[in-house]
């Protein structure tokens, strides 16, 4: 597993942070990537968010349920990092651990064997072995001062029989 730590200024648009943009440029292979929480600036071909600039404007879990299994080259998983951020969207279920687990189960179902899940947040949990994924890379992006690091994990779907 490759573990890196880099420093960069924080930005509300995760994918514009230089070390993260570089990671995505290296890791995104194929032309069928999905981003259920895209916001702005997502490199995925299929984007969804509650903001108007996304291709689709649906609840992320409902959006993920629409895809066929074992098809996507990869999924970018960059949900709101905290309950406070999640509540800004006004959806009560965003503060439920079950909601996030259900999203991860759908992501595991959608990604094809050998495909990637690239997750962003304040922890390194990713999708995990119990969903058939093996972590290959961790990028810690330090922002200094009182700002939490952004943690990026790259996982490969190595066992398609364990999707949840």
Q: Which residue stretches match the model-derived regions?
A:
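Class I S-adenosyl-L-methionine-dependent methyltransferase catalytic core
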Residues: 1-164
């Amino acid at each position: 597993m490759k573990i890196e730590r880099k420093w960069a200024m924080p930005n509300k648009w995760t994918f514009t942070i230089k070390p993260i943009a570089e990671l995505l440029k290296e890791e995104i292979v194929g032309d069928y990537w999905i981003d259920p929480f895209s916001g702005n600036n997502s490199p995925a071909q299929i984007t969804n968010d509650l903001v108007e600039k996304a291709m689709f404007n649906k609840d992320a879990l409902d959006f993920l349920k629409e895809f066929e299994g074992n098809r996507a080259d990869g999924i970018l998983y960059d949900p709101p990092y905290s309950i406070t951020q999640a509540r800004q969207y006004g959806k009560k279920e965003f503060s439920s651990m079950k909601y996030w687990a259900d999203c991860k189960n759908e992501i595991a179902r959608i990604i094809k064997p050998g495909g990637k899940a690239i997750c962003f947040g304040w922890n390194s949990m990713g999708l995990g072995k119990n969903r058939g994924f093996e972590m290959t890379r961790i990028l810690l992006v330090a922002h200094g001062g009182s700002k939490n690091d952004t943690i990026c994990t790259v996982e490969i779907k190595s066992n398609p029989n364990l999707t949840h």
